[in-house]
Amino acid sequence: TTTLATSNVNHIKNIIGKAPHIDILSVNTYAPNLPGVLGNLQSAGWTKPYMITEFGPRGTWQMNPEPERVLPWGGLVEQTSSEKEADYLKAYQENIAVNKDNGCLGSFVFLWGYQTHGEVLTWYGLFDKKGYTFPAVDAMQYAWTGRYPKNRAPVIATRNDILMNGKKAEDAIIVSPNSSNEAKVTATDPDGDALTYDWMIMKEKTASSDGSLPDGITGLIDDNTKKEITFKAPSTVGNYRLIVFVRDVKNKKVASAVIPFSVQ
């Protein structure tokens, strides 16, 4: 096999013409491009099996069709973990499972682990750094077996369920250095399990030495273990992300939501 980053028809034709011995084509593709893969393969004349070797929600590089999710300073509005869950399940059911008789051998969900590269380090990854599983793991179990796990991950239904100073992420929140602010998240647990809250603030496009999500900036949040918090904005002008992880500690399940904001 060989792997393509998209299902570009001309690239597929080149493979057919120059590497006819390849018997399985692998395609890495993300929403919204996944639905077009089969048609592109057929248009190019590919008649052998194929695999979707990466799939997931819309990538950080694919935001032009959703301009409201690109903030004036370049920050990107991220889906909640529950919104991502819905995207993973829809992608598999509508574009992978249904094509098993059209040559699709299967798929690899991106990312089975936690993210260690990329523009936004919470964008992908079905596990957090503690090893807790996000709702997308539940969705994939359902996609693969027809049954959800006995215990489900916490739910943060939409981006409207995390607010900073009463505003949602798309409102392009700008605050002054050292200003006082507040935030809250609305989360539920399908099984009624107790939930814990873990808030953090990080500067945009920073990472730990291994490329993963860094520890939050200390000294800003009064108490980061509540569903409603008060915090001081960083003293340094720049762009930041406010992140909350909501955990069912007993069952090692987690949900997340993010609000970008700018200090000016």
Where are these regions (language model features)?
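Short, surface-exposed loop/turn segments at beta-strand-coil junctions that are enriched for proline
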Residues: K232-G238, N251
